[in-house]
């Protein structure tokens, strides 16, 4: 079944990890996908890899989502080059971990600017086409730490909690146009981001996951694809934890 035939999607942070898997899942079911990431090499490589399996599905765009003007320009470019967007996935995210006592102002600003302001920038830039689109969807990738917090991640937890509040406000504001807006809150997923953890930290984390292991990027992509589908039309303003039971 091609759930996304004739659909156009934008996936930020699509160059690696969870975002690349989301782009692949949407492309596999017929979507044309704009793969957006910070560096040209990363989004270019991701698009090339997905195009090898699903020819012509992906176009790469190197843009910093924290840059408001650049995201406005990106929206225009995607509109001209691919078409009007139906699905926006805000997945770009960074960490700058450290205990609050040692956290620098720039660590706070970088994380909030990317993870939270980045979503504000893209929703502002793409909301007009979304409001006119068929089956319009916004899906924000939050985190379980935006729900339960995490020592050493005050900046990241605040950005993800903010993203959850933003999700609910956007869901209410755009509901009249049938645009749904939901958040997915991953637990610990195997990507470059979690590769930074030491083995001792990984073991401690796994001890707190009822299902007993880190998740895979496919676990998140499957949830995003469902929320992006026609079948999810009556779901909005919700947060779905995909976390092996961590937050139950
Ligand atoms: N992995 C986990 O366990 C986990 C858990 C909970 C939530 N999440 C969230 O899931 C999302 C994806 O995580 P991941 O683990 O796949 O991360 P990742 O492997 O570190 O990849 C992050 C992606 O975001 C892009 N990105 C970062 N800053 C950007 C910016 N300013 N503008 C545009 N793109 C930017 C990166 O671009 P480049 O490739 O060009 O550098 C990269 O493609 C993030 O929002 C993260 O917070 C992850």
Model-derived features with residue positions:
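The beta1-alpha1 cofactor-binding region of Rossmann-like NAD(H)/NADP(H)-dependent oxidoreductases
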Residues: 40-41, 62-74, 105, 219
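Residue(s) in the substrate-gating loop at a strand-loop-helix junction
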Residues: 143
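C-terminal substrate-recognition "lid" of short-chain dehydrogenase/reductases
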Residues: 135, 213-242, 247
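Conserved glycine-rich cofactor-binding loop
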Residues: 8, 15-17
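Active-site helix of classical SDR
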Residues: 123, 159, 167
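Substrate-binding pocket helix/loop in short-chain dehydrogenase/reductase
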Residues: 99-100, 104-112, 194, 205
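Alpha-helical segment proximal to the catalytic Tyr-Lys
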Residues: 128, 172-176, 233
